[in-house]
Regions:
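Loop-to-transmembrane-helix transition segments
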Residues: 12-20, 65-90, 154-162, 210-230
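Hydrophobic transmembrane alpha-helices of multi-pass small-molecule transport proteins
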Residues: 129-146, 162
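Helix-helix packing/entry segments at the starts of transmembrane helices
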Residues: 103-109, 176-192, 232-263
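Transmembrane alpha-helical segments that form core, pore/gating elements
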Residues: 29-32, 40-41, 55, 151-213, ...
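C-terminal transmembrane-helix exit sites in multi-pass transporters
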Residues: 91-93, 110-132, 256-266
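Membrane-interface helix-cap regions at the ends of transmembrane helices
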Residues: 2-5, 52-72, 139-151, 194-217, ...
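Transmembrane alpha-helices of multi-pass small-molecule transport proteins
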Residues: 37-86, 165-168, 188-205
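Hydrophobic/small/kink-forming positions within alpha-helical transmembrane segments
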Residues: 21-29, 56, 81-89, 111-116, ...
């Protein structure tokens, strides 16, 4: 049944998505740089731990934020963060296996899954133009992976699975914006995913991973600490301002940006 919501305001959505685009592009570059020294679980530990520390510091400075951590939808938070952690791990893994532009291009099968889930779970409207955009996106993916030819890489399946997981995470995140604040969603995300990352580090038995870093590695570490937060803050606020079906396709703008950066860096 079509949603009765008014059309999404384009201005705020575009502004928040510009922040999302820049943050996640910098995140990808930082992860790729650190992957030469650190395992993926160690990188995810840095991201979640720094998120908890920064958000806790904000709560100390602004005590009113503490009330925003409470949520009546903890089960939905658990589902969202479990799926998101898996998606993030697969995404980070794909960054070590494939060129940056290829990773981002294949990641953008997510809008198709988001469109379907948003219609089924959120009651959003799937227009003809949006269907066309989804179809064109899938055609682009087929051009990139070229299934059935020699150039096909099994590693492309890693990012395709990550895209499916991200789509579930995106729709549940949109659902959470209907009841929870941006601060609360971010704090719970980092607090839930930190033990998951630490468990991975524990099984590897290497808690001294920061000692392997030299002076040149700390810039991407700082990048992960901050853009890991700003990316999700901007994306959450974009979902608060507009429909998921409208917001997610704007992320396609990351492809030319990361292709340009990847060409000069790698």
């Amino acid at each position: 049944m079509p949603s009765s919501r008014t059309p999404s305001p384009i201005g705020p959505v575009l502004l928040w998505m510009c922040g999302t685009l820049l943050s996640f592009s910098l995140m990808a570059i930082s992860v790729r740089q650190l992957s030469f020294k650190l395992a993926l679980m160690e990188i995810l530990t840095i991201r979640s731990f720094s998120g908890v520390v920064i958000l806790s510091a904000l709560a100390v400075l602004r005590p009113a934020l503490r009330r925003q951590i409470r949520s009546q939808r903890l089960a939905l938070h658990a589902v969202r963060n479990g799926v998101h952690f898996l998606a993030t791990y697969l995404w980070a893994l794909s960054l070590t296996l494939l060129p940056l532009a290829t990773v981002f291009a294949l990641e953008f099968t997510a809008p198709a899954w988001v469109s379907l889930l948003a219609v089924l779970l959120l009651g959003e409207r799937l227009s003809v133009s949006r269907i066309g955009a989804v179809v064109l996106g899938f055609i682009g993916v087929l051009v990139i992976i070229r299934p059935g030819v020699e150039t096909f890489q099994i590693s492309t399946l890693v990012i395709l699975l990550a895209a499916v997981c991200f789509s579930v995470s995106i729709v549940t995140q949109k659902m959470l914006t209907q009841s929870d604040t941006t601060y609360g969603i971010l704090f719970i995300m980092n607090a839930v995913q930190l033990p998951m990352a630490l468990a991975g580090v524990y099984f590897m038995g290497e808690f001294d991973f920061l000692l392997r870093l030299d002076a040149t590695d700390w810039l991407p570490v700082v990048g992960i600490c901050f853009v890991g937060l700003t990316g999700h803050m901007c994306l959450t606020n974009a979902f608060r301002a507009g429909d998921a079906i409208f917001v997610v396709p704007l992320d396609f703008l990351r492809i030319p940006l990361i292709a340009f950066v990847g060409y000069f860096l790698y």
